[in-house]
Amino acid sequence: MSVSFENKETNRGVLTFTISQDQIKPELDRVFKSVKKSLNVPGFRKGHLPRPIFDQKFGEEALYQDAMNALLPNAYEAAVKEAGLEVVAQPKIDVTSMEKGQDWVITAEVVTKPEVKLGDYKNLEVSVDVEKEVTDADVEERIERERNNLAELVIKEAAAENGDTVVIDFVGSIDGVEFDGGKGENFSLGLGSGQFIPGFEDQLVGHSAGETVDVIVTFPEDYQAEDLAGKEAKFVTTIHEVKAKEVPALDDELAKDIDEEVETLADLKEKYRKELAAAKEETYKDAVEGAAIDTAVENAEIVELPEEMIHEEVHRSVNEFLGNLQRQGINPDMYFQITGTTQEDLHNQYQAEAESRTKTNLVIEAVAKAEGFDASEEEIQKEVEQLAADYNMEVAQVQNLLSADMLKHDITIKKAVELITSTATVK
């Protein structure tokens, strides 16, 4: 194989390489054996056409495209490796010569990884706005949240207040004409929940069971039903019941109802304090890691970030998100339907942060390279087993999905992140 690379501009160039006749001839033979099985040529049994007759009738060139399709991927990969390139986007391939009896010549316009000039990335001073201490208020807030989850709705005689639930019938109309979807019976509506369009729930506050209220509202300009958007409507609303939330007493019995592993309210508070402390510690560590990496990226200089890398990052992020949905048993089409979004919306969402993520990835990779980080066979095996456990997969499945090089890359990246983070100090 002959390989050459010519720089055209920063992070771009043309890779020229050949596929030798030593590789071409056996591949042409393989393609011919496959093709002749389906050939019907008068005077010959199907699948028994001699090669010289094929070449005479169809020309050896008829086999070239299939042979090229088979040979090109490995030839390109070998050429990239021999040229010592780190290609970061799909190449633009052009077959420049496929002469009979000659080596085939291919050119590939490639985008290469930009140079990263590292600044300080160890022993950084960072600031984080995360509180590690667990306060009594934190514990009480969590208990109160669980207490409210156990609350019951009881009928009240007094007028409805925000936070109450009303059971209502309603009939909506615009200019005296009822519209589709504007009617409901025995509907439970939490006042202040924001379930209905703005202004609806507020107009029921202060009214009691048995009353009928004319609720006048205006549909938002961006309302999903375009025929209703921006229009004023009247909802004749009858209140059947007003219910208030009744929370259980704050005592040992409540504690046992919340968590069967505790006996007293004091036990529950202590358990929650430990859990909150662990969660806050994790949040604090994440904040330090993020701040340290951001600082390392700010200290580095990246020589002209290729636009193609940003596109690749968006594509990777979208695929990762959709893959996670499917692993959770969620159909992507159903997700888009429920959220009222499209794949283009998802693409645009990741586009906004792709440049920052790409720069971060480049700097971390540069740190791993500068430190000479590698991954042992033992570390790779441990990583495979951890991924299998995390995603409830068989070890063999993970090994089939991820190459050793991919796993090694992930491990060295983790080591670089750990180095940046562990040597950082918080101001």
Swiss-Prot record:
Q: What is its EC number?
A: 5.2.1.8
Q: What does this protein do?
A: Involved in protein export. Acts as a chaperone by maintaining the newly synthesized protein in an open conformation. Functions as a peptidyl-prolyl cis-trans isomerase.
Q: Where in the cell is it found?
A: Cytoplasm
One Pfam family of this chain: FKBP_C
Q: Which NCBIfam families match?
A: tig (TIGR00115)
Covalent S-S links between cysteines: none
Q: List UniProt keywords, sorted A-Z.
A: Cell cycle, Cell division, Chaperone, Cytoplasm, Isomerase, Rotamase
* GO CC terms: cytoplasm
Swiss-Prot/TrEMBL domain comment: Consists of 3 domains; the N-terminus binds the ribosome, the middle domain has PPIase activity, while the C-terminus has intrinsic chaperone activity on its own.
One example of a Gene Ontology biological process annotation: protein unfolding
Q: Where is the PPIase FKBP-type domain?
A: 163-248
Similarity comment text for this entry: Belongs to the FKBP-type PPIase family. Tig subfamily.
Q: Which reaction does it catalyse?
A: [protein]-peptidylproline (omega=180) = [protein]-peptidylproline (omega=0)
Q: What is this protein called?
A: Trigger factor
State the Gene Ontology terms under molecular function.
Answer: peptidyl-prolyl cis-trans isomerase activity; protein folding chaperone; ribosome binding
Origin species:
Streptococcus pneumoniae serotype 2 (strain D39 / NCTC 7466)
The answer to whether UniProt assigns keyword Cytoplasm to this entry is yes
Q: Main localization of the protein? A: cytoplasm
